[in-house]
Each structure stands twice: as structure tokens, then as C-alpha cells.
């Protein structure tokens, strides 16, 4: 049995007369990995996200988590608990009038004892930095705060995987930075992260990147490997991370920096080393 999420020859179409949105894709995401999924609009990214926890069921093929199939009614809700999904618009996930009650909602549905609910609310609110917002109305919060509340609501039910479906796309720069930092911390603590994103700078933070185009996996590898594939990226209309573009521009002017520098911090460090040795 493959641990983690496994998609085997998965295809999906929204109705019988429509073209497939996903075409016989095979993906394995082991537990503990951080995978970013990039691709142009209409490539099937959000459909993939909904297939991962059974919100959608494959037209053909199989989606499993730790051997449990999303098609099996007996394990469907267990998969939903283990594979949480954070949407682009967090307001669609709010059901209560205070943050505290919203965090409690998922646990109540799953029959958590009251004592454990109180404990989990305290733990996850501190973990994502919203403990000072517990008595606030979710709809009055900033975009970044709303996303962190949505993340905390997923964390409260103790999942193994969190799927972020364009979770930073509607946020301002500070909100995006806060949510990305939360992703990093969750991954460092052992959480499996799948980030569906159009932001290549966000994708460069992951340990693995998938490029989807026209419902097929065109690239699958480390950020350094994927973002080196200029022709395939350009064909899909995907830019490279800013730091890598700048590195290539510097190289064209004779400034050679080692490795593929995908993050701003890596580029700054490499430039300091270059300056000190020249």
C-alpha cells in the first residue's frame, strides 16, 4: 500500500459530452512532502484539488489516501478529515458568528469531546497566530486573517494533508506573506502540503513542482529542475521565479552565480558571496 495521496490513471470530465479536464494523470504525494501545482487557467488545477479529498470523484481511474479510495462510501469521511482543503475565498468556509465557534464547528461534526475541542482551539489558534481574534466575527477580518482562520479550522480536526487551492491569490502582499509563512511552519512540523497556485515565487518554496497543462502533467520535479525547462514553461504561459530571471540576466552580463537561485534570499546571499570573492 502506497502511503500518502495516490492518483492512478485519473481522468475527469464535468459531463459526458465535455472534453476531459484531466487526462489519465498519475501522481504520488508521499506524507511529509510539499508539492506545488502550477499551470495556466483551465489546466485542471482546481479540479485536481477537489479530487484529492473526494469533493469530486474521478470519471475514471482511482484516487486513494493511505490505501482508502475516495469512491468507497465507507472511507469517504475519513479521507475528508485527513485531507483538508483551503479555498481561494475563505468566506465560503465560515459557518459561525465568531472565530472560536467557527473553529469548533468541524470538531463538533466529528464528535470531538468538549475538553478536546477547547484544547484544540487554543493550540491551533496559537499555531497560526489568531489567538487574539477568537471572539471576532470572521467576516470582519482582513484577507490574510480570514485565510489563517480557515487554515486553523482545518488544523483543528487533525488532518495529515492540507490542500491550498489558490489560497493566496486574492490577498494583498502582507496577507500572502503571512499565509506562505504559515505553510512553511506547517511543513516544518511534518504536515503534507499541496499548494495549487499561479504564483511561481510561491511554488519555488515547495520541495516539488508539478506543471499541469491541458489536463496533463507536463513536468514533475524539484523547483530547480522544473524552472529550468524554459520551452515547456513558455508553451504553458508560465514565467520563471523573479530571482531566477534576475540570475539569468546577470549571467548574460558575465556574473556567474552557482546553482539555480529561485528565492530572493538565495540570490542575495549568492550576490554577497560573489562580491566578497571578486
Curated annotation (Swiss-Prot):
Q: Which CDD domains match?
A: ABC_cobalt_CbiO_domain1
Presence of the UniProt keyword Lipoprotein in the record: no
Q: Indicate how the chain sits in the lipid bilayer.
A: Peripheral membrane protein
Q: Which residues bind ATP?
A: 39-46
Write down the Gene3D superfamilies for this protein, in alphabetical order: P-loop containing nucleotide triphosphate hydrolases
Q: What class of enzyme is it?
A: translocase
Q: Name one GO molecular function term.
A: ATP binding
EC code: 7.-.-.-
Where located? Cell membrane
Sorted UniProt keywords: ATP-binding, Cell membrane, Membrane, Nucleotide-binding, Translocase, Transport
Q: Matching SUPFAM superfamilies, A to Z?
A: P-loop containing nucleoside triphosphate hydrolases
Spell out the PANTHER family in the cross-references. ENERGY-COUPLING FACTOR TRANSPORTER ATP-BINDING PROTEIN ECFA1, HEAVY METAL TRANSPORTER
Q: How does it assemble?
A: Forms a stable energy-coupling factor (ECF) transporter complex composed of 2 membrane-embedded substrate-binding proteins (S component), 2 ATP-binding proteins (A component) and 2 transmembrane proteins (T component).
- Record family assignment: Belongs to the ABC transporter superfamily. Energy-coupling factor EcfA family.
Q: What does this protein do?
A: ATP-binding (A) component of a common energy-coupling factor (ECF) ABC-transporter complex. Unlike classic ABC transporters this ECF transporter provides the energy necessary to transport a number of different substrates.
Record-given protein name: Energy-coupling factor transporter ATP-binding protein EcfA1
Which source organism?
A: Halalkalibacterium halodurans (strain ATCC BAA-125 / DSM 18197 / FERM 7344 / JCM 9153 / C-125) (Bacillus halodurans)
Name the lineage. Bacteria, Bacillati, Bacillota, Bacilli, Bacillales
